Amino acid sequence: MVYSYTEKKRIRKDFGKRPQVLDIPYLLSIQLDSFQKFIEQDPEGQYGLEAAFRSVFPIQSYSGNSELQYVSYRLGEPVFDVKECQIRGVTFSAPLRVKLRLVIYEREAPEGTVKDIKEQEVYMGEIPLMTDNGTFVINGTERVIVSQLHRSPGVFFDSDKGKTHSSGKVLYNARIIPYRGSWLDFEFDPKDNLFVRIDRRRKLPATIILRALSYTTEQILDLFFEKVIYQIRDNKLQMELVPERLRGETASFDIESNGTVYVEKGRRITARHIRQLEKDAVAHIEVPVEYIAGKVVAKDYIDESTGELLIAANMELSLDLLAKLSQSGHKRIETLFTNDLDHGPYISETVRVDPTSDRLSALVEIYRMMRPGEPPTREAAENLFENLFFSEDRYDLSAVGRMKFNRSLLRDEIEGSGILSKDDIIQVMKKLIGIRNGIGEVDDIDHLGNRRIRSVGEMAENQFRVGLVRVERAVKERLSLGDLDTLMPQDMINAKPISAAVKEFFGSSQLSQFMDQNNPLSEITHKRRISALGPGGLTRERAGFEVRDVHPTHYGRVCPIETPEGPNIGLINSLSVYAQTNEYGFLETPYRRVRDGVVTDEIHYLSAIEEGNYVIAQANTNLDDEGHFVDDLVTCRSKGESSLFSRDQVDYMDVSTQQVVSVGASLIPFLEHDDANRALMGANMQRQAVPTLRADKPLVGTGMERAVAVDSGVTAVAKRGGTVQYVDASRIVIKVNEDEMYPGEAGIDIYNLTKYTRSNQNTCINQMPCVNLGEPIERGDVLADGPSTDLGELALGQNMRVAFMPWNGYNFEDSILVSERVVQEDRFTTIHIQELACVSRDTKLGPEEITADIPNVGEAALSKLDESGIVYIGAEVTGGDILVGKVTPKGETQLTPEEKLLRAIFGEKASDVKDSSLRVPNGVSGTVIDVQVFTRDGVEKDKRALEIEEMQLKQAKKDLSEELQILEAGLFSRINYLLVAGGIEAEKLDKLPRERWLELGLSDEDKQNQLEQLAEQYDELKHEFEKKLDAKRRKITQGDDLAPGVLKIVKVYLAVKRQIQPGDKMAGRHGNKGVISKINPIEDMPYDENGTPVDIVLNPLGVPSRMNIGQILETHLGMAAKGIGEKINAMLKKQEEVSKLREFIQRAYDLGTDVRQKVDLNTFTDDEVLRLAENLKKGMPIATPVFDGAKESEIKELLQLGGLPSSGQITLFDGRTGEQFERQVTVGYMYMLKLNHLVDDKMHARSTGSYSLVTQQPLGGKAQFGGQRFGEMEVWALEAYGAAYTLQEMLTVKSDDVNGRTKMYKNIVDGNHQMEPGMPESFNVLLKEIRSLGINIELEDE
């Protein structure tokens, strides 16, 4: 493998054995591709905005004299970029402009004669745009639209599994689900009649639908039954024989023909009998007359002489009727062929319970069921039925639905109409009856071939179509009513309903979620999440166990591990690493093709349905170098089951061992050694890790860290290769390689970095450059690390030296003992940024004012405010401090005589306003890092706002002019090169000012042309600079668009530094979570023979019962990695020769059996080896991919190479006594995370505060500044102790004795610690409640 300069800085040793056939795909493509499909113009009109427009337009007037046609659309440029939208709290969106054509036809002229055509571009609201990272900025906050897993449109056959009826009889049903429109259900009842429901309403006999489709009884029977034909000859009854139909029956008479008796009376008819009959080609047999009694006739029989109906279709024959038929000359009788085995009489029975007899009565019956209480008319009934399933406006199966429908009915073509046909309905009924007869299978609803993914683009398109349909009605009215000659398309379209529908979807849909932005992994996981909830999906309460369960088809498509614990378990899933959706929205996963027993590198993506037809080998199957299977029998999956197959039966093989799991689970090393429940917790807790101040790459990783860090978008990645020309904390400039430049550009790429920005979860987003001046860069290299990334690798926590041993009960029940060194070195110190906003509104009594002149506030409280009343940047504030001074006018109150006097003397007006300043919440302290002031248009800006504006302008100017200088320098260096090549001496050029170079002429015409081109570019650059600066200035100085009634908003950003402390929650990556119980002095911690103390002591009892052994293997491997790092560090300190260093590092990389990674350090220069060693001295990072990781033998080898005992256990000494512990302890390095459940956010203390209105008891919870509830059980405890006075205090003055607590407070202030308990308010509430039941209780004084 060839490494780029940047990749050579630190190479992760990979223990993976299987070759990587397929690179990990871009992890956010499910979001970006879907949205791209939505907004890009599709000439076919199959999907996106184009499809929505084409489905609604053209809109015709009721009279048909005019229509509004759609021509095309375009999306404009967004007004603000993403960052500006976040700061200003607006939506990042682009205006949608649609070109419409109004066509007016001549009234009297023949059809289609055009009178007038008007074309115009119409504004149709704003469409939110997706950022490069797959998110949306809605009202300033980043949101994610989660993909939905819903039931695919199509037809499904199912059964109730015997749960509906008490007899336990299995009732089958079929359901046709369209993409939009009414559902059509067919179901059997316990009496085996077939019923139909429309939209889950009252059920009707299924034949009503057929009658409504104009079928007669005869035609219905003809469709569903085979006929048995009897001939009456010479007063004898002969039956046309189909021998196969006799199978399994018992002969009720001798079956004979031409004197041969084939079956005797009373004998069961077997296959042998049938073969004999077929062999002898017996076509007719004579049957006794009684045999036909009770059979059902297949058609109407009429006496031809009189026209009298002798017997109607579907009536049972009797001997009398038979005689009548015979007399009237009918010699051929057709009856229905039914039996109890596989030809049930269901439709025949259903026709009997069907109250209708013709089409009209059927339509009326359907109308009554759909619109109960409305009087049916023929026209209304016909329209209703037509619109239900046969109108393209109201009903659409969609391409997916039609494909699934046809596949289910075993048709060859997969395309077709989006509405139902007669044939569709009959085929569904036939298949359902077949299933009832025991032919065919019911579908599995939870199979991923029956559930599809609906992504952002599709949901947005549906929402947009809803908005368009609302507009359509209004347009129809306008076309019919308005004066068409003066109307323009713009007058007809009201963009409000469209933008409202879109806004509603992005702002408040259940699937539009506030992005989880704790760390890069939580962002990526949120975007790859798949939810079964949401509109058109399941509900938590109704979802049973089957839906939530892992299904065999989840393999390689949906992760079996990563799902929330709690009520949503199994309903919210995560996409597997390699999974993608196909054109129909079904999940597919890649496999390697196997041809003639050889595994090729040809990759096919298979959906769940296609996969069922193949035999698929696992990724860890042993292959030889040519790709043949080593073993004769191979473990494979086929039709959802695992079993052994011979090697020539195999069709496909898995692409990778990580194929099964999601991104989150693929980051857990040794996942294969963890119990699934703990792995689930591990995968979920990684998403809650808070980015630490100094990111630290995991010593033991899985090799996925780089992919996650780069794809998440938190790092700055080089778009093109080049050389680093300039680096500072907030900007990186790359001079692009010649071969990657576009013709005629300056060839400079500038990357501006994000500094100290607040994330959605109040953690800190900050980018730091990780390249140096002059370094060569290749496309795709990481230039700057974001939060939780270290040299372009995901780094959620810190590598800690852990020991598994008990320590004085401080690690009882998963508690964690931490060394003070961890705090001193700031290993788990995190920065949290809070945004506090102060809003100044216009009230009825006058505007609120932001000012430093606040009544009744001392000088000290105002010391951190400037003259405008806004806090300085850099001020350190604590709970209760004023951040923004604000006063609100209050109503005139009745003045006391004293106040009147004071007013008269001093003219004091101060009491007209009350203090409503923004203060720091209790328990929060931090540093002000930024202040933003937003002022409404037309409101005068205060001094601070103008200062901020000036600063922003200065900064913008500085940024742009620096950019210009860099680009100019690039341009002039090319001009210089050109002029020198053209024969001008370099010394002479240096004497001339650079601007004059452009005036020089060259004799070579070609070079002169190039020079003129560059001169043009230079002018363009300057012009562009002026334009950009002007645009920036306009943006900064314009007023802000604030909500109605808001004059000013001041936002203050506080940075809070939080060190780790007892009560904080920590976890490893294997579901091993705990709470810090104590921070122990370094000298008290257990230490090894070298005197190195451990950082963290964990309880060994947390491992065996939880079966997450992965943490132990990680600890051993981490120890080995650290040992090798220490050896490298020792060699660097001794300043050993580079050759020795190279040899040792090479040994470490080469260690292990049959690993795929080949690192050849001989191709590295000495400087590169030294830089690599410098980055490896803290420990050599190791990758152990999921299900393909390091073996025990390899871990032992690595431990020995690092000069450590191969058992992974060492002798420890007690830090307090210096005594040796009696047995060896497992010590190593484990990657620990600090989770976003910090004690500072959870704990608070209350003295006095607010009370509940009715019970007068203190509120609960930190948000309400509430108290700690002393509940029923706690009262029992005090009663049991007999602590009477404590109990009295708890139930009265400490809770809801209103007078008592007020007195108590006064007494404490006066230094008199007496208490006088009174009547608790809750007792009064109880009295009131009893009185409300009509029982009067009164308390009497004795």
From Swiss-Prot:
It catalyses: RNA(n) + a ribonucleoside 5'-triphosphate = RNA(n+1) + diphosphate. Keywords: DNA-directed RNA polymerase, Nucleotidyltransferase, Transcription, Transferase. It is an enzyme of class 2 (transferase). GO terms for biological process: DNA-templated transcription. InterPro entries: DNA-dir_RNA_pol_bsu_ext_1_sf (IPR042107), DNA-dir_RNA_pol_bsu_external_1 (IPR019462), DNA-dir_RNA_pol_su2 (IPR015712), DNA-dir_RNAP_su2_dom (IPR007120), DNA-dir_RNAP_su2_hyb_sf (IPR037033), RNA_pol_bsu_bac (IPR010243), RNA_pol_bsu_CS (IPR007121), RNA_pol_bsu_protrusion (IPR007644). Its EC number is 2.7.7.6. One of its GO terms (molecular function) is DNA binding. GO terms for cellular component: DNA-directed RNA polymerase complex. NCBIfam families: PRK00405.1, rpoB. The RNAP catalytic core consists of 2 alpha, 1 beta, 1 beta' and 1 omega subunit. When a sigma factor is associated with the core the holoenzyme is formed, which can initiate transcription. DNA-dependent RNA polymerase catalyzes the transcription of DNA into RNA using the four ribonucleoside triphosphates as substrates. Belongs to the RNA polymerase beta chain family. HAMAP family: RNApol_bact_RpoB. This is DNA-directed RNA polymerase subunit beta.
